[in-house]
Amino acid sequence: MQHKQAMQTMALAAVCQAAWLVQQVARNGSCDEESMRCLLQGVLITDPNNAESVYPDRTLLREGYKTLVEQLGNNRNPKNVELTRYVIGMVALERKLSGKRRVLSALAERVSQVKRQAFHFDLLTDTVLSNLAGIYSDQISNLGPRIQVSGAPLYLQQPQVQHKIRALLLAGIRACVLWRQLGGRRRQILFFRKKVIAAAEAALRQL
């Protein structure tokens, strides 16, 4: 049971990290590349042996765990409403996606194409990012209310920044899929918040 909670929390931390990185890119035009790469690699792992193999290096999820603790904790610091909005938006889109077999099939085919492309190009090249962004735009964003990203107009109007943001939203939804597969439900965040925080804090101590 403790291991299951740890894996659910890992997946939720990945969702939070995607939201955090979206915010960084929208505000600054860039973000920590290794933290981003970790999440994008998770998108390409479609048939994992176990949950750990989706995010094998959990040190790269540090910001996600920290964000999870800060957003759910009872600390006096004000919550980041923007991050909460992104997380809720990704969870909602994943729920819409889960019931649409035709969309899931098309999405799987597009991800397979990116996998083949990733043999020849680095994940963070705009060639790959634009294709990941295209998957989000074509297959997912229209399933429900669009996630409105706030940031600096100077950056948000740049195609490369748009590609990064959409690729990260796709990565966040992939993490939502894993979280749900592991038994994660929204009510657990509401009613078992202390357990989630404790698991995230335990993970941070080990990083």
UniProtKB/Swiss-Prot annotation:
It is a peripheral membrane protein. It holds the Pfam family DUF489. GO terms for cellular component: cytoplasm; plasma membrane. It is found in: Cytoplasm; Cell inner membrane. It comes from the Bacteria. InterPro entries: HflD (IPR007451), HflD-like_sf (IPR035932). Keywords: Cell inner membrane, Cell membrane, Cytoplasm, Membrane. The keyword Membrane applies. Belongs to the HflD family. NCBIfam families: PRK00218.1-2, PRK00218.1-4. This is High frequency lysogenization protein HflD homolog. It comes from Tolumonas auensis (strain DSM 9187 / NBRC 110442 / TA 4). The gene is hflD.
